Amino acid sequence: MDYITEFKQRHLRRAQLKQLSILEEIDRICRKHDIEYWLDGGTLLGAVRHGGFIPWDDDIDIAMTLDDSRRFAEIAPNELRSGLVLQTPETENTREPIMKVRDLNSFYVEGNEDFSLDYSKGLFVDIFPFIPYPNVSRSFCKRYGKAMSKCYSILHHSHQYSWRATFELFYFGAKFLFCKSVWAAAFALRKCDTYISNVLINNGYGIMHRRDCVFPLSTIEFEGKRFAAPADPDAYLSDLYRNYMQVPPKEKQKVHAVFILPDLIEEAEVKK
């Protein structure tokens, strides 16, 4: 085990507990203002399969409807406790089109972090906005959802000036507009009363969930506390991972982050 890997493993649990405290703060605000959220992705998987964090996981994912995420964005800046900040594409020059609640007294580096952009890089909870989807086939969603998300990611990634970069901008720009028009037609011609999922530019795997597997929300235990969860976690996780109860082999049990530092300043010093 190299030094960086050993360092991450040594600090992982402290980072997880700090992220748990961020989730508790989000939960407090949502309860106070009747905002619905639910555990999503690997966090929901961890709750079902492990009763908490997946042992090697280093982030927390939750979801909200787009309307509730907008309400949260209005309320949270004035409600979050000291040391936490709401990060959005409107408040900081981030590379991702999602909201995060960040801890300012920590440092977290992802593999594709962009250090040319000035934005907070502390531990976080991801908040994914969900929208109703048209009643289309899952294969349609996978084909055009993945394509649109990939094009968006490439178009918003840093590029060096070259003939290849210029070609990519034109090619993926045209492909993005085509996929966007296909989706616009689907939204216009089909009802949107059966499925719900991440906004299109975030739906890199082309996933759709039935609304009745999400609502009405339930609760689930995560690290000894109860948080909101989809109505049918089994169906929800099957959409995402298929055989989700199967633990991956040891060589795939890797921390996502390149580097984690849970505390920039020790808490005792902060309180002085």
Give, region by region, the residue ranges found by the protein language model.
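Conserved catalytic core of two-metal-ion nucleotidyltransferases
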Residues: 3-33, 76-135, 153-160, 164-240, ...
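A short secondary-structure junction signal
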Residues: 136-143
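Short, surface-exposed, charged/polar-biased interaction segments
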Residues: 58, 65, 93, 148, ...
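Tryptophan-centric aromatic hotspots in well-structured domains and transmembrane helices
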Residues: 38, 43, 55-56, 215, ...
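Aromatic- and glycine-enriched beta-alpha-beta binding-site module
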Residues: 132, 144-146
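Long, hydrophobic, well-ordered secondary-structure blocks that form the structural core
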Residues: 54, 64, 69-74, 78-87
